[in-house]
Design a protein with these regions (language model features):
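Active-site glycine-rich loops that stabilize anionic/oxyanionic intermediates
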Residues: 70-73, 283
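Active-site-adjacent alpha-helix of alpha/beta-hydrolase-fold enzymes
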Residues: 201-275, 289-304
Length: 392
């Protein structure tokens, strides 16, 4: 017997995405924690594996993290080698492991065998399909990747900063073509994308110093510092060398606070952005903390775990500025009626409700499903903007 699901069609979602989701309903079950998605995009069969934490419901509006493999690898490589599934349970996030065409991504590199597929379009269609199926949050979209997957994450942030809240690149920079296309005037605050870049100085595949059609790791980071309007001088901290036998050490370069990640016209109401660079001196073309054999080439740093650091940067304490950079929290834990009273009637763009990521939300007087419990920013009737802890 066939079971059909009712859909509420939205104008802002292309019809093709709905057709993808309707097709997927017939090829996988809804109970599995890891699901293989297969659909056509741009005339090509595209696949991805998706992990959903146990017990999650679409109403939870979880964030979505794309984990992109390196050249010659696959989504399965990343799933089996990086430990993101366990972290997804801790941080309550959906993880997607897409597959590139011919095990590569269209990074505009000109490298022999590189993909020419519309990977930006595919990955956004995948994100929209997952959002419609599992209820992930539209603006809580992240991408990270190894090597070519890092290149692709940079391209996503350059071309679609309106969709991604943050990216992370491990051993991946930008091609000179992609880098040139990414340059331009500073973006408005609501289009800033936070960056975490991790790179070994002894990387023999994607050189730390650049070359072979790629820019250097430091050039990538510095361009993002300018793009996000960060301080020119970073705070530099040496990570403890807890594992002395790995032939490498780590320095963290943190550029913060950058331009506020909030809507224009709110007087910097959004939290400050940031750029973080982890320089692994002596590190190879590897994923720090990884123990899987044949994953990369060269020294593997063991002083930190790249996957854990990425998830913390995306969704944990690393996602926020320091306490001194944030407005004081109020002790008040208001009811919904106290928070929403009057806001739904206001047409003033400087008033409203913003989440912790600086995204402005329309206020519905009765529909509270769009708002998570936790910290929200409110401004009403010319009052000073302030953070409020909304109830469960």
């Amino acid at each position: 017997m066939l079971c059909f699901t009712a859909f509420h069609f939205r104008k802002d979602v292309p019809l093709g995405v709905y057709l993808v989701v309707l097709n997927l309903l017939f090829v996988f079950g809804s109970d599995a924690q890891t699901t293989t998605l297969t659909f056509q995009y741009g005339g090509l069969n595209r696949t991805a594996q998706v992990y959903v934490p146990p017990g999650s419901q679409p109403s939870d509006s979880l964030p979505l993290v794309l984990v992109l493999h390196g050249f010659t690898q696959s989504g399965t490589t990343m799933l089996n080698s990086t430990g993101f599934n366990a972290l997804a349970q801790q941080y309550r996030a959906v993880i997607a492991y897409p597959n590139g065409v011919n095990n590569g991504w269209n990074t505009q590199s000109g490298m022999p065998g590189a993909s020419t597929a519309d990977d930006v379009g595919y990955l956004l269609a995948l994100a929209d399909s997952i959002r419609l199926r599992w209820g992930t949050r539209y603006h809580r979209l992240y991408s990270c990747g190894f090597s070519a997957g890092g290149f692709m994450s940079y391209r996503l942030a350059c071309e679609r900063p309106d969709r991604f809240e943050a990216i992370a690149s491990v051993a991946g920079t930008m091609s000179t073509t992609a880098f040139a296309a990414c340059q331009g005037p500073p973006l408005p605050p609501s289009f800033h994308v936070r960056l975490l870049h991790i790179h070994g100085t002894s990387d023999g595949v994607v050189s730390y110093a650049g070359g072979n059609g790629n820019v250097s790791a430091e050039q990538c980071v510095q361009s993002w510092v300018v793009r996000a309007q960060c301080p020119s001088q970073p705070v530099v901290v040496a990570l403890p060398n807890t594992y002395t036998a790995d032939g490498s050490t780590v320095e963290e370069f943190r550029y913060a606070p950058c331009a506020p990640l909030g809507p224009v016209g709110t007087n910097g109401a959004g939290r400050p952005g940031q750029v973080v660079f982890l320089k692994v001196t002596g590190g190879g073309h590897t994923w720090p903390g990884n123990t899987a054999p044949l994953f990369g080439l060269g020294n593997v740093n063991r002083d930190f775990q790249a996957s854990a650091r990425i998830m913390d940067f995306f969704l944990g304490s690393g996602a926020a500025a320091t306490s001194s950079e944030l407005p004081n929290f109020t002790d008040k834990n208001p009811t919904w009626s106290e928070v929403l009273d009057g806001l739904s009637l206001s047409n003033d763009p400087s008033e409203g409700l913003w989440d912790f990521w600086g995204r402005r939300y329309p206020v519905h007087p009765t529909n509270h499903g769009d708002y998570d419990s936790g910290l929200w920013l409110t401004r009403y009737q010319g009052q000073t903007t302030k953070w409020l802890k909304l109830p469960q």
